[in-house]
């Protein structure tokens, strides 16, 4: 398996799909990375290696081209940096006590969804309340 941005990407998949296994890279960004890599590859190596396309499988890519992919992918915010940024944004919302921050703190849906009947994913499993037994009868 090839390693890009400290993530093992699957060998048997196309490069665009394999790059999507990295947090923060979707299909459009993966396509953009492949296009930039193809341009850089042509400048650096010329016709030495087959030109990278969206349909190229990861196992068909040699180490030099993989290094170019790593360099291009490094320019984007992914994995740990992106996780940290998202968490700091949520922490900021909680600290300023805005509506979204309060919803995050309470563990309720943030984006205006109705919670009367649904929202079980965000609220967690139902908590049943025990009925009191009558004493003295």
UniProtKB/Swiss-Prot annotation:
GO terms for cellular component: cytosol; small ribosomal subunit. The keyword Ribosomal protein applies. GO terms for biological process: translation. Residues 114-137 are annotated as: Disordered. The keyword Lyase does not apply. Keywords: Ribonucleoprotein, Ribosomal protein, RNA-binding, rRNA-binding, tRNA-binding. Residues 119-130 have a biased composition (Basic residues). Part of the 30S ribosomal subunit. Forms a loose heterodimer with protein S19. Forms two bridges to the 50S subunit in the 70S ribosome. PANTHER family: 30S RIBOSOMAL PROTEIN S13/40S RIBOSOMAL PROTEIN S18, SMALL RIBOSOMAL SUBUNIT PROTEIN US13M. Located at the top of the head of the 30S subunit, it contacts several helices of the 16S rRNA. In the 70S ribosome it contacts the 23S rRNA (bridge B1a) and protein L5 of the 50S subunit (bridge B1b), connecting the 2 subunits; these bridges are implicated in subunit movement. Contacts the tRNAs in the A and P-sites. This is Small ribosomal subunit protein uS13. The lineage of its organism: Bacteria, Bacillati, Mycoplasmatota, Mycoplasmoidales, Metamycoplasmataceae. The gene is rpsM.
